[in-house]
Amino acid sequence: MAGTFLFTSESVGEGHPDKICDQVSDAILDACLAEDPHSKVACETAAKTGMIMVFGEITTKAQLDYQKIVRDTIKKIGYDDSAKGFDYKTCNVLVAIEQQSPDIAQGVHEEKDLEDIGAGDQGIMFGYATDETPEGLPLTILLAHKLNMAMADARRDGSLAWLRPDTKTQVTVEYKDDHGRWVPQRIDTVVVSAQHADEITTEDLRAQLKSEIIEKVIPRDMLDENTKYFIQPSGRFVIGGPQGDAGLTGRKIIVDAYGGASSVGGGAFSGKDYSKVDRSAAYAARWVAKSLVAAGLCKRVQVQFSYAIGIAEPLSLHVDTYGTATKSDEEIIDIISKNFDLRPGVLVKELDLARPIYLPTASYGHFTNQEYPWEKPKTLKF
């Protein structure tokens, strides 16, 4: 189609080894916050065959049973039998956790009022929103997430009992560029790979994934005779999860955010409490971007914040409205400054971040579930 372009995003399921690690890290964070909302948590996880290792720095009053937290998380994901390549009952759980460095503590939060706590580190964070879907997310990443969600649901309800937790999806959308606004035209390509039980044939698997997952998730009017399907392109995928690949927390930051439609600051989200602006300020940036689009100030926008360790106020604000705005970028920055207090100690209150809410964010993107406070646009005064 003339005047159009292709854009692609990928997603991974709960049983992908990197996503296992994200979920374990956030399960530990939630366990800390459930007992001590002031916990300082920086928890990383690594996974390989028969082994989970959690390591990092945690200062908390919570009494944690790391073995139980890790095993319960893996059980919930669905790795409950060695035949699936991983078993929560028999895997080794290694723990190497120390307390937060006192050098960081004195520079960031000790002897400071909540509103004045500094950023936990330097860094840059991006937020993005678009009017192409009700969720304010690119259609590419939204559909990729929904395909993985549908496979998890079909695995759990038994309708596709041969499915295993490690799944991957990728969706290519053909867009029209309407003066900077992205307007979806059709689905160009769908890629689905799924770990499976040994007994199902590749032919049956492909047919069932197409009819029971793809055609039920993707709007029928977006599919046409030219849509390309790559379902289980490798053929066999019995060995998956940590047995197939090593996993690490924080290796799926594009999946977690905007599917490549926006710049990424580089800091991962999972396993970090609100004092880490990698997470809290990225959530705030999403909140700001979504609020700007909801207010009709633009059709698509990316915002950037930067922080320095120990300093509460952001060092810089930048916006890119891609030519879709009703006001200048300078005016929009002024609107942001007058409507949002972006200090971490204020964000924790406005977005209610000192709660055990993080484990669900570690699957299917941090900006997909519309019930989170950062997904609810703020009414702007301008």
Swiss-Prot record:
Pfam families: S-AdoMet_synt_C, S-AdoMet_synt_M, S-AdoMet_synt_N. GO terms for molecular function: ATP binding; metal ion binding; methionine adenosyltransferase activity. Its cofactor is Mg(2+); K(+). ATP binds at H16, D166, T167, K168, S234, G235, R236, F237, D245, R251, K252, A268, K272, K276. Keywords: ATP-binding, Magnesium, Metal-binding, Nucleotide-binding, One-carbon metabolism, Potassium, Transferase. K(+) binds at E44. One of its GO terms (cellular component) is cytoplasmic stress granule. Binds 2 magnesium ions per subunit. The magnesium ions interact primarily with the substrate. The keyword ATP-binding applies. Pathway: Amino-acid biosynthesis; S-adenosyl-L-methionine biosynthesis; S-adenosyl-L-methionine from L-methionine: step 1/1. L-methionine binds at E57, Q100, D245, K276. It comes from the Eukaryota. It catalyses: L-methionine + ATP + H2O = S-adenosyl-L-methionine + phosphate + diphosphate. Disulfide bonds: none annotated. Catalyzes the formation of S-adenosylmethionine from methionine and ATP. The reaction comprises two steps that are both catalyzed by the same enzyme: formation of S-adenosylmethionine (AdoMet) and triphosphate, and subsequent hydrolysis of the triphosphate. Belongs to the AdoMet synthase family. In yeast, there are two genes coding for AdoMet synthase. Heterotetramer. This is S-adenosylmethionine synthase 1.
